[in-house]
């Protein structure tokens, strides 16, 4: 038996939010004025336990899931997270176990995560410009901390990271080229993400959206872009 979506496409990916806390306050995700931004989070007893998460993963693997993404909040804030990764990675049938993180805590955990069986890491980084980064992160964290986290991941053996960048007009769009250039020959993949409407929590404004076509043109004007074939059925990202 395989689980499918409403278009009858097989669902191979499972995304699990292991907690709602975060050490940053990104304006498009957890702005300071939101409940989470003000420090109002779920009590620990209301979060899925390690055993419950492991049980759910096993159930979904039996239904055809092969890839598991661990997200938050910031997953590395969860006590015992490395041990949770170890338990999930031991489940037969999982071909890809990934983490999405802001990378600030990676220097402490990267080697242990690699040893525990984590396969990939996606890092959220919206700008290399310190002022822009701090503005978008709610005046928390630094670019240096994120880059140190990326370096720690590389040294631990994570050779191909994904760098997620949410692009907003007149906020960080003017810094995109520097970020793309920084990672261009690194072996990592930069993913430019349009500012998405997720309700009124992140104060979404259409005027802040930079269409992907505009970004492609700016990048292509400096470096030739060639489309890359999709890697899986139903994939929505366009690769170059």
Language-model features and meaning:
Residues 2, 43, 128-131, 205, ...:
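Residue-level signal for pocket-adjacent positions within structured domains
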Residues 172-176, 185, 189-240:
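A C-terminal junction/extension of Radical SAM enzymes
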Residues 1-72, 76-95:
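Conserved alpha-helical substructure of the radical SAM core
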Residues 50-69, 77-189:
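Radical SAM/AdoMet-radical enzyme domain recognition
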Residues 39-47, 134-141, 204-207:
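Short glycine-enriched, charge-decorated loop/helix-capping segments at active-site entrances
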Residues 33, 72, 101, 125, ...:
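Residues that line or immediately flank small-molecule/substrate-binding pockets and catalytic motifs
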Residues 31-34, 118, 137-141, 220, ...:
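A generic structural signal for secondary-structure junctions
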Residues 34-37, 128-130, 197-200:
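A short, flexible beta-alpha/helix-coil linker loop
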């Amino acid at each position: 038996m395989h689980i499918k979506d409403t278009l009858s496409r097989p669902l191979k990916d499972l995304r699990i939010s292991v907690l709602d806390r975060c050490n940053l306050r990104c304006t498009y995700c957890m702005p300071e004025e939101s409940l989470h931004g003000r420090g109002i989070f779920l009590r620990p007893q209301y979060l899925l336990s390690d055993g419950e998460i492991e049980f759910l993963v096993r159930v979904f693997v039996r239904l055809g899931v092969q890839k598991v993404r661990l997200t938050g909040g910031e997953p590395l804030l969860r006590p015992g997270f490395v041990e949770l990764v170890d338990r999930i990675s031991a489940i037969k049938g999982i071909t890809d176990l990934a983490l999405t993180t802001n990378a600030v805590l990676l220097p402490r955990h990267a080697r242990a995560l690699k040893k525990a069986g984590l396969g990939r890491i996606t890092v959220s980084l919206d700008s290399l410009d310190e002022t822009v980064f701090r503005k978008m992160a709610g005046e928390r964290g630094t670019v240096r901390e994120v880059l140190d986290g990326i370096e720690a991941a590389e040294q631990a053996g994570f050779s191909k990271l994904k760098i997620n960048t949410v692009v907003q007009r007149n906020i960080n769009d003017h810094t995109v080229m520097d970020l793309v250039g920084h990672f261009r020959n690194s072996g990592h993949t930069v993913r430019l993400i349009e500012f998405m409407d997720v309700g009124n929590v992140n104060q979404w404004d259409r005027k802040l959206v930079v269409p992907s076509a505009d970004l492609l043109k700016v990048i292509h004007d400096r470096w030739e872009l060639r489309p890359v074939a999709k890697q899986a059925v139903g994939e929505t990202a366009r690769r170059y």
